[in-house]
UniProtKB/Swiss-Prot annotation:
Keywords: ATP synthesis, Cell inner membrane, Cell membrane, CF(0), Hydrogen ion transport, Ion transport, Membrane, Transmembrane, Transmembrane helix, Transport
Membrane-spanning segments: 3-23
Subcellular compartments: Cell inner membrane
Signal peptide: none
Topology in the lipid bilayer: Single-pass membrane protein
Name of the protein this chain belongs to: ATP synthase subunit b
GO molecular function: proton-transporting ATP synthase activity, rotational mechanism; proton-transporting ATPase activity, rotational mechanism
CDD domains, per the entry: ATP-synt_Fo_b
Cited Pfam families: ATP-synt_B (PF00430)
GO cellular component annotations of the record: plasma membrane; proton-transporting ATP synthase complex
Domain of life: Bacteria
Annotated family: Belongs to the ATPase B chain family.
Keyword RNA-binding: no
Length: 156
C-alpha cells in the first residue's frame, strides 16, 4: 500500500470520526453541558433570591420586633396611666367618704350639743324655779339673795 493512500484513508477515517462525533456525540454533550450550566445558573439565582428573601425576612422580623416593643411600651404606659387613674379615683373616693363621715360626725356632735343645751335649759329652769322658791320662802335680804345667787351660779 502506498503511503499516500494510507494517509488519505486515515484522513478519510478521521473526517468520518469528526463527522460522527459532530453529529451524534457532540450535540448531546453540548446539550448536557448547557443543561448543567442552566441548572448551575438557576441554582445561583435561587441562592441569590434566597439571600434576598432572608435579608427581607430579617428586616421584617426586626420591624415586627420593633413594632411589638413599641406596642408593649404603649400597653405598659397605658397600664401605668390606668393604675394612676384608679389610684386617683380611690383617693377621691376616700376623701369623699372621709368628708361624709366627718359630716355625719359633725351632725351627731351638733345633735348632741343641742340635746345637751336643751338638758341644760331644763336644769337651769328647774334651778331657777327652785332658786325662786327659796328666795320667796326667805325674807328679802340682800346678803341672803347674794348667797343664793352664788349658790345657783355654782350649780350651773
Amino acid at each position: 500500500m502506498d503511503i499516500t493512500l494510507t494517509i488519505f484513508a486515515q484522513a478519510l477515517a478521521f473526517a468520518g470520526l469528526i463527522w460522527i462525533v459532530a453529529t451524534k456525540i457532540w450535540p448531546p454533550l453540548l446539550q448536557a453541558i448547557e443543561e448543567r450550566q442552566q441548572k448551575i445558573a438557576e441554582g445561583l439565582a435561587a441562592a441569590d433570591r434566597s439571600q434576598k428573601d432572608l435579608a427581607q425576612a430579617q428586616e421584617k422580623v426586626n420591624e415586627v420586633l420593633k413594632d411589638a416593643r413599641t406596642k408593649a411600651n404603649e400597653i405598659i404606659d397605658q397600664a401605668h396611666a390606668r393604675a394612676n387613674q384608679i389610684i386617683e379615683a380611690a383617693k377621691l373616693e376616700a376623701i369623699a367618704e372621709a368628708n361624709r363621715q366627718k359630716e355625719l360626725a359633725q351632725t351627731e356632735i351638733d345633735a348632741s350639743a343641742t340635746r345637751a343645751r336643751e338638758e341644760l335649759r331644763k336644769q337651769v329652769s328647774v334651778l331657777a324655779v327652785s332658786g325662786a322658791e327659796k328666795l320667796l320662802k326667805r325674807e328679802i335680804d340682800a346678803n341672803a339673795h347674794k348667797a343664793l345667787l352664788d349658790e345657783l351660779a355654782a350649780e350651773i
